[in-house]
Amino acid sequence: EGLADGTIEVIATDRAPHTAEEKLRGLARSAMGIVGLECAFPLLYRYLVLPGTIPFGRLVEAMALAPRRIFGLEGGVEPGDEADFTVLDLEAEYRLDPATFRSKGRATPFAAWPVRGRAVLTVVGGRVAYDGRN
């Protein structure tokens, strides 16, 4: 509801790529946090956008445009800009599998959840940073 009505402006992830060893030290000594970056978009798209809870544009605003605006970050996709953007395959359906995460962190409560949407290309500063293979 807060995301839909604008009360919540930004969706951020806790990029906590801790190894299994760092997570298995007991509650008081374990590294806190879970992998969020690789799960966030496909989870939010599948469970908020597709059922109609929020429109796709609202998700893009909360995950990309609002953070850029709030932090005063440069970049855009106009001629002459050093573009930062990600191309998404919105039809890709799969189950989250921590073994396939590029992060060294594998801790997630969302393992095996069905999701939809996958990053297939990321451009940072006008250069390809990820092309689905690297």
Mark where each language-model region is:
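C-terminal cap of metal-dependent C-N hydrolases
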Residues: 26-29, 79-134
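His/Asp/Glu-enriched, well-ordered alpha-helical/loop segment
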Residues: 5, 10-11, 16-90
